[in-house]
Design a protein with these regions (language model features):
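Short, low-complexity N-terminal intrinsically disordered segments enriched in polar/charged residues
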Residues: 20-68, 77
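Exposed beta-sheet edge and beta->alpha loop/turn motif
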Residues: 102-156
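Residue-level signal for mature regions of secreted extracellular proteins and peptides
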Residues: 10-13
Length: 156
């Protein structure tokens, strides 16, 4: 009887250890999701500001130079067309995260934006769309305990 109780105690402690191990890995995933959510909630208003002002330096802690260069090109293309974009982020929700090797991730988000296109150099409104939903795919890289955007693409 005593050996049965000892065996049962060992089995229960092993089950508890395995359960705790699974809980901590889920906790790591939740922490990762929160880190990415906070980063995107910080970055996206700065992205909107870059489109409005043409100032990109605030993006540097969050996006790789290649991504900043592609944003710069899009803003230049709008300028050539005589347009300036004023964007306001309404919400961002992470739909999916596929992470690998601790330092890489693909993230899919659902973002809602208010977009107003002005004629360059004036407040004349050329187009406006409020509460525009977008599904966006990001490629992220972790470095120095923070995530950076390597690539951002609107899916729909």
């Amino acid at each position: 009887m005593r050996s049965t109780l000892l065996t049962l105690a060992i089995l229960l402690s092993g089950t508890f250890a395995v359960a705790c191990g699974d809980a901590s890995s889920k906790s790591d995933e939740e922490v990762e999701r929160e880190e990415i959510q906070v980063m995107l909630e910080t970055y996206l208003p700065l992205l909107a500001q870059a489109y409005s002002t043409g100032q990109y330096s605030a993006l540097e802690p969050y996006a790789a130079q290649k991504e900043i260069s592609s944003i710069h090109k899009r803003v230049q293309d709008l300028t050539v067309q005589g347009r300036r974009l004023e964007a306001t982020l309404r919400s961002v929700t992470i739909e999916d995260i596929k992470a690998w090797n601790y330092s890489n991730a693909y993230v899919t988000t659902h973002e809602v934006w208010d977009l107003v296109v002005h004629a360059t150099g004036s407040d004349q409104v050329l187009a406006e769309e409020y509460e525009q939903p977008n599904r966006v795919k990001y490629q992220l890289k972790r470095g120095d305990d923070s995530w950076r955007i390597l690539f951002r693409q609107i899916q729909e």
